[in-house]
């Protein structure tokens, strides 16, 4: 298990957050500033938001001894990027009513809305909730939005594979009701009744990204994800998924310990039950072995390299309770 002597500051904030609640309710009631408390700024990411300010106005406002012009960015959780017409119309309404008026489509198949003032954040979430949209775990040290190359309308096969994005997203959601209590005014039933077997009270050491693709198309860059599922198709039927672990292309300038890495294809699972179990337990390994001291070295790729691919696969098999088959042949010819 991970044995770093000194935990990073965010680790202490997470464990003391009471299930990602922190003092968010109190921060929202503070009308003196458009910001929220410093520790809440870390926690609000797990709710799918970032606190931002207008950099172009910093000097002007400082000269007038005014606070920065703070606002929030909200990123929705949309597994596989599929929205209904009603949901898109709601996003258009929210963008016009509460934001800069711009809807940004991200590379991970979701949307972001910027410029939301503090007193408009709750109405934003309440509008989205009416059409079954939320921003839970769209940011933060958790599984992020699940990307999938498949368009469900292309064929029944594509539809069945696209459904994995939603299943995985639901499987890996935090169990805390904090989002519903803070933004949707859900009443808290009792103290200390929540348990989260996956994230516990520490969550993950860093963000975790999952992509699903159907060869020969690789438009989600599946090997650039912390975990990738590569659909294996034979005679027009889904036989299972190759599992790729440890991808990530980001590096930190001037830090030679950081590096880009393509995911390693470590094995194959032939049933939905086994695939979902392997995905889940991959996260538990990252939770337990990931670096919680240095966030620059905390992604899955560093965990995999520190453990070694063979040791990682053995640990995954141990946690899953079944052997991981060897990878099946596949080929990418287009993106």
Locate predicted features.
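Peripheral terminal and linker regions in Fe-S/redox and tRNA-modifying enzymes
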Residues: 1-335
């Amino acid at each position: 298990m991970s044995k770093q002597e000194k935990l990073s500051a965010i680790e202490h904030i997470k464990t003391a957050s009471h299930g990602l609640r922190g003092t968010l309710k109190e921060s929202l009631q503070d009308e003196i500033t458009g910001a929220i408390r410093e520790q809440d700024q870390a926690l609000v990411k797990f709710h799918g938001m970032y606190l931002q300010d207008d950099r172009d106005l910093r000097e002007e406002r400082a000269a007038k001894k005014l606070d920065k012009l703070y606002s929030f960015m909200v990123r929705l959780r949309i597994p596989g990027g599929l929205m209904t017409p009603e949901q898109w119309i709601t996003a258009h309404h929210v963008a016009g009513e509460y934001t800069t008026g711009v809807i940004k489509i991200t590379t991970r198949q979701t949307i972001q809305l910027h410029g939301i003032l503090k007193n408009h954040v709750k109405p934003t979430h309440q509008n989205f909730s009416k059409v079954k949209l939320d921003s839970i775990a769209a940011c933060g040290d958790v599984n992020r939005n699940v990307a999938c190359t498949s368009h469900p309308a292309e064929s029944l096969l594509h539809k069945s594979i696209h459904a994995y994005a939603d299943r995985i997203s639901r499987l890996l959601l935090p169990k805390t009701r904090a989002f519903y209590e803070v933004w949707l005014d859900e009443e808290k039933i009792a103290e200390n009744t929540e348990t989260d077997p996956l994230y516990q009270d520490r969550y993950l050491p860093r963000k975790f990204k999952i992509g699903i693709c159907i060869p020969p198309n690789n438009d989600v860059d599946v090997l650039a994800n912390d975990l990738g599922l590569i659909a294996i198709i034979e005679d027009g039927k889904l036989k299972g998924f190759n599992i790729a672990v440890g991808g990530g292309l980001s590096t930190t300038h001037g830090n030679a310990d950081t590096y880009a890495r393509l995911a390693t294809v470590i094995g194959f699972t032939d049933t939905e039950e086994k695939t979902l179990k392997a995905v889940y337990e991959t996260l538990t390994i990252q939770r337990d072995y990931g670096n919680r001291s240095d966030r620059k070295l905390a992604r899955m790729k560093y965990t995999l390299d520190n453990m070694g691919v063979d040791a990682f696969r053995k640990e995954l098999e141990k946690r899953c309770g079944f052997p991981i088959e060897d990878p099946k042949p596949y080929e990418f010819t287009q993106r």
